[in-house]
């Protein structure tokens, strides 16, 4: 185990308050900016154990057969993400950091993007390379040598909250993103309706895997510290509200529409590096 930095990594304040205690783990909130953080948290050695090969097979699956109907269904579930990035970039090189099995990248490839990924799991990396034919680099993003100013789109789907050093992750992104490239980040938000309604049972806490807990405000501020401006955002509909209204027969057809009026589990943003920061 190790302690989180004493000063908030976002604003530098040291004042904190307990946000939630779950399964003997404690998550605090910076009283100045609102960034949530796990403290104490797993050490680097423990992190490597947490993300052993079985992490994916225990929490997800063992990698779907690319010829199966289940695989095609899984790729269809990634299409909303592909549509999200295509609203700002129609083509180009996509790098997915924390790509897991590579399903999102496979969906992107089907839409004409050139794709590659990064992940710490040998199990998932091997599957992506051997079963899907997707080039994936094995290792921590800060330890890898990535091509400079090469990628048009860099994505982090539920990656940043796992990173022991999110500042380092953003520094890497800045170095390998093209001048006109975009960064896409998706993180759980503890300010969303789902978290606020479920709280203790909300799966976005995901202790001890999630080191950081964002709100839309802290995510935008974090990106700003690295010279990025948010140009597009997406607030997923509330699954809690959808399920609630879906149980009422007469309202079931409108449950999804009603749920869109409430913030959901996660927030996604597209950010671009400010022109004034590109030389820094």
State where each predicted segment sits.
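S-adenosyl-L-methionine-dependent methyltransferase catalytic module, highlighting the catalytic core
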Residues: 142, 156, 164-172, 176, ...
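Conserved N-terminal segment of class I S-adenosyl-L-methionine
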Residues: 1-149, 153-157, 167-170, 234-238, ...
């Amino acid at each position: 185990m190790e302690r989180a930095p004493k000063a908030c990594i976002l604003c530098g304040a040291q004042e904190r308050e307990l946000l939630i205690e779950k399964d003997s783990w404690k998550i605090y909130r910076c009283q100045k900016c609102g960034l949530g953080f796990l403290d104490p948290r797993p050490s680097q050695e423990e992190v490597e154990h947490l993300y052993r090969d079985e992490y994916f097979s225990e929490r997800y699956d063992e990698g779907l057969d690319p010829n199966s109907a289940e695989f095609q269904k899984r790729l269809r579930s990634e299409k909303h993400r592909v549509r999200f990035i295509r609203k700002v970039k129609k083509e180009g090189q996509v790098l997915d950091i924390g790509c897991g099995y590579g399903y999102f990248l496979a969906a992107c490839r089907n839409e004409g993007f050139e794709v590659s990924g990064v992940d710490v799991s040998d199990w998932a990396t091997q599957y992506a390379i051997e079963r899907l034919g997707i080039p994936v680099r094995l290792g921590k993003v800060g330890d890898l040598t990535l091509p400079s100013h090469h990628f048009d789109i860099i994505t982090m789907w539920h990656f940043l909250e796992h990173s022991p050093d999110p500042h380092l992750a953003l520094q890497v992104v800045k170095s390998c993103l093209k001048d006109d490239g975009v960064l896409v980040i998706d993180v759980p938000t503890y300010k969303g309706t789902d978290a606020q309604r479920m709280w203790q049972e909300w799966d976005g806490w995901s202790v001890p895997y999630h080191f950081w807990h964002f709100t839309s405000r802290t995510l935008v501020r974090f990106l700003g510290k690295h010279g990025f401006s948010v140009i597009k955002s997406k607030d997923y509909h509330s699954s809690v509200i959808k399920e609630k209204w879906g149980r009422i027969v007469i309202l079931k057809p409108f449950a999804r529409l009603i749920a869109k009026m409430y913030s959901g589990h996660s927030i996604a943003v597209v950010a671009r590096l400010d022109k004034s920061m590109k030389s820094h």
